[in-house]
Amino acid sequence: MRSSFLAFLLRKKPAPAGNVADNTRVRTKPTSVVIRQFWLLTFSIFLSTVWLLPNHYLPWSTFHMDAWAALLLCGMSLAVILRSPSVASWNSMTLMALTLACLPATQFVSGSITFAGIAWINSSYLLGFLLALHIGNRWESATPRQLADALFLAIGIASIASVGLQLYQWFRLDGIDIWSMGQGQGRPYANFGQPNQLATFLLWGLVATCWAAKRAYIGPGTAIFVAAYLLLGLAMSASRTAWLALGFFTVMSWVWRRHCSAKYMPWLVMGLGIYFVACTALLGELGELVKLPAVDPFDPSRMVAGARAQIWSMLLEAALERPFWGYGWGQVVEAQLLNGLNYPSLYSVYAQSHNLFLDLALWNGIPVALGIFIIVAHWLYKKVSAINSAESVLLLLFVLVPLNHAMLELPLHHAYVLLPVGLVMGAMDSAENNQSIFKARRGILLAILLLAFVMLVTIIRDYSRIERSYLQLRFNQVNPAAFAPPDVPDVVMLSQWREFMRLINFEPQPNISDQQIEWMRRLTLLYPSAGFSQKLATGLAFQGKKSEAQVWLKRACNVNTASQCEALQNAWSRQSKQNQWVAQVPWPE
């Protein structure tokens, strides 16, 4: 009789197994048990909640998901470091991650990054990725397959629950509103806040289902049923990225069919693909029949690149203007503002380019981006060349799913995607310990973990204060007479949001200094709202810099909505009647 996934995790002795990432040798048993089964199950359950949290609020909409994922990684990292062999292997991927983690600080010192908080946030994510690579490597080396079992169980739980939330949202039910965010407006997204993010996660759920079936934790019938259920959710997301991924899955099922124990697997994958297409086609008809919202996935307007072509063209030009050093981590908005007037208005701010490689070029310059591309491409080439089992195929697909998405959007900008990818990449590298560039004692990893934990706790502490101030701001904007302006939060790391709140409360005066102008300019390059642009343009008008004031008004209309631009124009007109300096700056044509 087939044992269940939960039964496996609660067994007292792990099943003998070879290392899933080891393609040169087979182990008859694990060298040690890193995490005991009860705690492994507990970890999986807690990890599954990362992707189910409904808290998505400005100014950092994914903060709670990312922070919870990072806290769980820190806790598990300590256990793995202390309970696994003492030597830590450093390879090209971990050295690249370490180098990247240091870059934001270097860019802040050199002036490329304008606020220390931007450097702190980006370094913390990169440090988390570095830690995940090491932990995945050590965990897989010590207890093969245990990491993948725990991770895929967590993903399986969360993906099944997420499709349930999608159905809840699509049918417009009520009763669990505090556990569900929004209705999805025709594209239910569970608690991810964005349909394409959910689609990538459901693709992970399909990989997890295949893993459970391959490891005989569930039977073939159960696996097919779960896959069909997840594909229904994937169809409801109406994600075009998912179509690319499923097409790739289908092709690869034939390319790697020799690694499948069931010879009918490619045909089964094709059948499930046809089922997905049918679900996609029927959902629109069903929604119209029962008066439920639905997005037509075959709408020609959704089958084109939309604004992406213009975004990529504009930001590629921006990257070529600073080819060697870039704009600094997290500074894509600056690139958009400085180059956007050469292109038609996008009426939106883009903090990312929607292409990982272009982001890397904008952040670090083209040479660094090319270096990262070469290292990652070489890593992928080695993993593809070394495939010799269904398990290694599934782990590679796990990494390729978000990489595919990252060419069109930004899944790897979130810790709840980046950290699991790092864990699996590290696990896949565990077979190459003997090919590492150098080895060091685990004290270095403990130091990295301590630094990451201190940064994480400080960021959580800072953001809790920022969140309170932002809530005050929202109340004040709704009813200024009843609610006071927001307090300026006392923070240690997240200085950019402290300055954001300061500028909210700041009003330019005729005697404004050059330092104050530069401070407003730096903040507006990060947060180019209509209000901040108006304040900066007013300050420039006080200094007689009429042309620059007009440029900033143009930039504001280029990246804000048409209604916001109209409101800014009306506000500037009213201000001109009351202020002689502003009156000398006509609204730009």
What role is predicted for each listed range?
Residues 150-161, 261-284, 448:
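Hydrophobic alpha-helical membrane-interfacial segments at the cytosolic entry of transmembrane helices
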Residues 58-63, 117-118, 192-196, 238-241, ...:
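Membrane-interface catalytic loops of GT-C/OST-like multi-pass glycosylation enzymes that act
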Residues 71-73, 250, 390-444:
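Transmembrane alpha-helices of multi-pass inner-membrane enzymes
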Residues 194, 309-350, 357, 364-368:
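TM-adjacent membrane-interface loops and short helices in multi-pass inner/ER membrane proteins
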Residues 188, 249, 276-312, 465-478:
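Flexible juxtamembrane loops connecting transmembrane helices in multi-pass membrane enzymes
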Residues 1-121, 125-153, 212-221, 435-515, ...:
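Transmembrane signal-anchor hairpin modules in multi-pass inner-membrane enzymes, especially those
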Residues 9, 41-53, 70-79, 105-108, ...:
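Alpha-helical transmembrane segments of multi-pass inner-membrane proteins
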Residues 57, 114-123, 184-198, 300-306, ...:
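Short aromatic-rich membrane-water interface segments that cap or initiate transmembrane helices
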